[in-house]
Amino acid sequence: MEAPIVLLLLLWLALAPTPGSASSEAPPLVNEDVKRTVDLSSHLAKVTAEVVLAHPGGGSTARASSFVLALEPELESRLAHLGVQVKGEDEEDNNLEVRETKMKGKSGRFFTVKLPVALDPGSKISIVVETVYTHVLHPYPTQITQSEKQFVVFEGNHYFYSPYPTKTQTMRVRLASRNVESHTKLGNPSRSEDILDYGPFKDIPAYSQDTFKVHYENNSPFLTITSMTRVIEVSHWGNIAVEENVDLKHTGAVLKGPFSRYDYQRQPDSGISSIRSFKTILPAAAQDVYYRDEIGNVSTSHLLILDDSVEMEIRPRFGLFGGWKTHYIVGYNLPSYEYLYNLGDQYALKMRFVDHVFDEQVIDSLTVKIILPEGAKNIQVDSPYDISRAPDELHYTYLDTFGRPVIVAYKKNLVEQHIQDIVVHYTFNKVLMLQEPLLVVAAFYILFFTVIIYVRLDFSITKDPAAEARMKVACITEQVLTLVNKRLGLYRHFDETVNRYKQSRDISTLNSGKKSLETEHKAVTSEIAVLQSRLKTEGSDLCDRVSEMQKLDAQVKELVLKSAVEAERLVAGKLKKDTYIENEKLSSGKRQELVTKIDHILDAL
């Protein structure tokens, strides 16, 4: 009985394909030519590889419908984006399908890329592999003073890490500056300005690794969004409200030693690696834009409306140095007809999962909450890439009864390539739109009924005149603070006009700036004088402090105008440059002292 079983087993093993046969293995492929470009000019590492992939055949007649892409073990954990395209074709809808896979006994991450057309033996295809890595440029030294420049270290691979052999390869490294402390010398690389060229390297075996290291100056903004919550609230009454809560951190070299605001404002190269401001691109239809932090509205931001977008310059209250953090909120409204589509009771919301915050952005952790109208059902989400979903929540706001459904999604390690649309499908019964108007009618009915009863009752209310007086004084003081800050801003703007005049020597620019300063300064000073009179009427002792501040401001204005006169004399050749610089230094010191006194008075107010 056992003999026939043994014979059948031996026959099955003889007929089964061996592990090395063509039926059990994918066709062998070869990287005929690889051109790598490693862009290290920002705080991201962008690696682009142009690969000529060949199917040499080698006795195999099988067609290759896909190939395997590998990432180095040292960089795999910091991968933010991976895209593969066929070279020479339009970018739209040209991304090849990529799925992560595993290779037994090999380290690193591996992906299977599906080819648009299967490769026959002897044929080739040119592809472009784009990868973006975050937090792989490490500051060295890790701490610098305000006046020092920032240097970083990057470690990678000289070779194109691949499961296939490579016949020839070159690598070009683009740095942020020409100031290079050191770099590896494999193959005697050439250097031109901020470019390092390695190779060509010949006949590179599969899975080859050789450490590439470069230590160079990089003062680009190392700005990272450590946490961001994006809330999208949809209303069927024509509006979509968007609000973004952003936690920012400068992840470059940590500031060592004291910080001098005077040097920071006076010297352009002071804190060269710090972040003074950045630009956020909002949708073209954005309206009612606001920007605030824990203190309140930040008035130093600027909004520029363009044809295809709204550009917002965000300037934090203080410059960001290495290790420093800040938090702010940006919100705006959008018309729903541009993003919300419907067919009967079927609705589709198409919006960006994450939008532009700043150039070369890095988001460590993103939470997106999409608040749908009350009564939305059968919710489905189509995302352009993998996202993590949390259980749906309920959100209650005005006139809600059983709550609005909230979609909660998460993703980590995002870059600009993740700025893509997400589509949310749901059903909504339009009859439910009558719910809120009926609730409003009922609320007004109850209100009027309550008022009718209230006016027929007699209540005696005792007022507190002292409390009302304090509230009036506080309101007037707040207006004075706003106007004083506005007046100081006029001086800063005029300083910029004087600097432009010294460069262009256009006297009309200076005269126009003087006229604008006089007009606006007179208007603001008059408003402060009116508020000072109101404080005096209220019997507040703050009136004297405002009067003192007015006197100090007159001295500041005198110094500002004197500085403009000195600039005219300098441009006209009536004043030597050394004398001008010395006078300007003395004037700046006096002016800074006066501004400090004004700040102390403002703090007292």
UniProtKB/Swiss-Prot annotation:
Signal sequence region: 1-22
Keywords: Acetylation, Endoplasmic reticulum, Glycoprotein, Isopeptide bond, Membrane, Signal, Transmembrane, Transmembrane helix, Ubl conjugation
Residues that bear N6-acetyllysine: 185, 536
Gene Ontology CC: one annotated term: oligosaccharyltransferase complex B
Modifications made to the protein after synthesis: Ubiquitinated by the ECS(ASB11) complex. Ufmylated by UFL1 in response to endoplasmic reticulum stress, promoting reticulophagy of endoplasmic reticulum sheets.
Tissue: Expressed in all tissues tested.
Residues modified by glycosylation: 297
Disulfides per UniProt: none
Per UniProt, location of the Glycyl lysine isopeptide (Lys-Gly) (interchain with G-Cter in SUMO2) cross-link in this chain: 536
GO terms classed as biological process: peptide transport; protein glycosylation; protein N-linked glycosylation; protein N-linked glycosylation via asparagine
Entries under InterPro entries matching the protein: Ribophorin_I
Top-level division of the source organism's lineage: Eukaryota
Intervals, Lumenal compartment: 23-437
Subcellular location: Endoplasmic reticulum membrane
Pfam families (alphabetical): Ribophorin_I
Family as reported in the entry's similarity comment: Belongs to the OST1 family.
Stated role: Subunit of the oligosaccharyl transferase (OST) complex that catalyzes the initial transfer of a defined glycan (Glc(3)Man(9)GlcNAc(2) in eukaryotes) from the lipid carrier dolichol-pyrophosphate to an asparagine residue within an Asn-X-Ser/Thr consensus motif in nascent polypeptide chains, the first step in protein N-glycosylation. N-glycosylation occurs cotranslationally and the complex associates with the Sec61 complex at the channel-forming translocon complex that mediates protein translocation across the endoplasmic reticulum (ER). All subunits are required for a maximal enzyme activity.
Assembly: Component of the oligosaccharyltransferase (OST) complex. OST exists in two different complex forms which contain common core subunits RPN1, RPN2, OST48, OST4, DAD1 and TMEM258, either STT3A or STT3B as catalytic subunits, and form-specific accessory subunits. STT3A complex assembly occurs through the formation of 3 subcomplexes. Subcomplex 1 contains RPN1 and TMEM258, subcomplex 2 contains the STT3A-specific subunits STT3A, DC2/OSTC, and KCP2 as well as the core subunit OST4, and subcomplex 3 contains RPN2, DAD1, and OST48.
PANTHER family xref list: DOLICHYL-DIPHOSPHOOLIGOSACCHARIDE--PROTEIN GLYCOSYLTRANSFERASE SUBUNIT 1, RIBOPHORIN I
The name this protein goes by in its record: Dolichyl-diphosphooligosaccharide--protein glycosyltransferase subunit 1
Organism listed in the record: Rattus norvegicus (Rat)
Gene behind the chain: Rpn1
